[in-house]
């Protein structure tokens, strides 16, 4: 409804939204290669291909953006950094910024499985891929248990001179917060067409 309203009001252009859940064999398991498989490529390559195959009015040359919330915020920031050439911009809400924080937002942590030989911190992935990093924004609620980690990511990016947008708003780690701030993501994407 949010995107449809913003399109109808002329605030953003028409677009196709594909919103997968990462839940392969557990929360966060779709954001990395592991067990000898490139599971991270399914969001980067297969979701856009599936949208095209489903008849969405998009082509291989259509702009593609990545966004997420909570664990999906980790996915958006990390995949967006690692595969910067695939995305026009990145947006994230209430993000896990380090896989070792996963216990704060999921019931069954897979940290020991997910952290084998991979970068586990968003900051390290952004630093490693800073030359190809798309325009990036992220936000967090003032009552969110991940606020400190999001502030730290913001401070570290500022210290490293990496351009980004960071905002804080009232609210916590909850759907009402994310629903309110989806508009910020869509407007940010519209600015980067």
Regions found by a protein language model. Give the residues of each.
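Non-catalytic cap/lid and distal C-terminal segments of serine-dependent acyl enzymes
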Residues: 1-193
């Amino acid at each position: 409804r949010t995107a449809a309203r913003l399109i109808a009001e002329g605030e953003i252009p028409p677009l196709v939204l594909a919103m997968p859940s990462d839940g392969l064999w557990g929360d966060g398991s779709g954001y990395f290669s592991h067990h000898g498989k490139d599971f991270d490529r399914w969001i980067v390559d297969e979701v856009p291909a599936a949208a095209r195959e489903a008849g969405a009015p998009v082509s291989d040359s259509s702009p593609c953006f990545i966004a997420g919330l909570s664990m999906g915020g980790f996915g958006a920031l990390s995949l967006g950094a690692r595969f910067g050439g695939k995305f026009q911009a990145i947006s994230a809400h209430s993000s896990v910024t380090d896989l070792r924080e996963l216990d704060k937002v999921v019931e069954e942590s897979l940290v020991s499985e997910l952290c084998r030989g991979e970068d586990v911190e968003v900051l390290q992935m952004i630093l490693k891929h800073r030359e190809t990093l798309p325009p990036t924004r992220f936000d967090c609620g003032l009552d969110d248990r991940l606020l400190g980690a999001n502030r730290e990511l913001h401070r570290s990016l500022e210290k490293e001179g990496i351009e980004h947008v960071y905002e804080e708003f009232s609210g916590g780690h909850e759907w009402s917060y994310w629903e309110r701030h989806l508009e910020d993501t869509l407007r940010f994407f519209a600015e980067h067409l």
